[in-house]
Amino acid sequence: MKLKEVTEGKVRIFVPDPKEYMIEGKFDPSWAPVFYNPKMTFNRDLSVIVVSLLKPKIILDALSATGIRGIRYYVESWKSEQLILNDKNSTAASLIQINVKNNGIENAKIFNKDANALLYEIKSEYIDIDPFGSPVPFILSSINATIRNGIAAFTATDLSPLEGSSRTSCRRKYDAINYKLSSSKELGLRILIGKIIREAATLEKTVHPLFSFYADYYYRLFVIVESGARKADENINKNLKYFGECPRCGFQTFVDENCKTKCPICGENFIIIGPLYIGPLHNMEFLKRMIDTYSDFNYLSSFNRIQKLLNVIEKEAKYKSVFYNISKLASKLKVSAIPPIDSILECLGDASKTHFAPTGIRTDKGYEEIIRCVKSLR
């Protein structure tokens, strides 16, 4: 395997040389013997900031590939007492050895095991699951392996089922009914969180989002893992419901059950999806710490993008409602000219943009008030 040295953040690692694995002049990271995706640098950059605040004693990256994620945590975030890197691909495990040594890390434990098998053998304060596709096969084992009040982090790149484009796949993987709706970018994340909550409950554990976001073609989520059957029951009863959108007028709301429910505005039957999580997507105290800290990481290649994302999330996080997609709403209302988002925000007064969609707004003001602004500004 021919290798190429690359720099990401403050580390230098060896990865398979893309030129050796091109097909008709094109390259996909999955074609190489060991997976390395430079397009996930933003994901890893933000994760470095999160881990720097958590300072876990043990870090476990269960699907390490080149080892880039765990190595960056150790070098840039926090020199944990123990760094555990694993990949079931023996070629990857050998490459991890090289990259760990190349970055002067002496206390790393490297495994060449199936991720689930390892997760049932080891407990950790911080566990990272960054798979190629869905994290579902690893949810139960990773929650089981996370100690009380520890953190589990998940990446999901299978947006087709989560956003409602592949309904049967969503039902199979996430045990949720799904349709493509106006706010599916956010609803997909809520379906993912709902699935993790239900899986954790089978272990008499529960989870609460610490920080989460959507970017490019994936969701990234950090959850606090708590123990106790009572806490699990309380979280399910309080925060797992369904979501309804009116196909005629665009009114949307959370609903208690998956049953025929009529829109209170126009009387049309709702399209119902779920179950999904309806609570806050971030821990506000932790979010404030991120905003106070991220400037220390101005060397990151995606620093400006991180700054923009956190600025938007800080504003939208205070609202409890799912965002309204003004473009889709205007279409349902037969409004030909979509008003500028900034004008709608000014009209509403108490509202913000959302990082989920460029034409989305988030507000706790009522549907009628939103419609008034959309129609008055057309």
Swiss-Prot record:
Metal-binding in keyword set: yes
MF (Gene Ontology): tRNA (guanine(26)-N2)-dimethyltransferase activity; tRNA binding
Class of enzymatic activity (EC top level): transferase
Reactions the enzyme catalyzes: guanosine(26) in tRNA + 2 S-adenosyl-L-methionine = N(2)-dimethylguanosine(26) in tRNA + 2 S-adenosyl-L-homocysteine + 2 H(+)
NCBIfam families attached to this UniProt entry: PRK04338.1-7, TRM1
Role of this protein: Dimethylates a single guanine residue at position 26 of a number of tRNAs using S-adenosyl-L-methionine as donor of the methyl groups.
Name of protein: tRNA (guanine(26)-N(2))-dimethyltransferase
Encoding gene per record: trm1
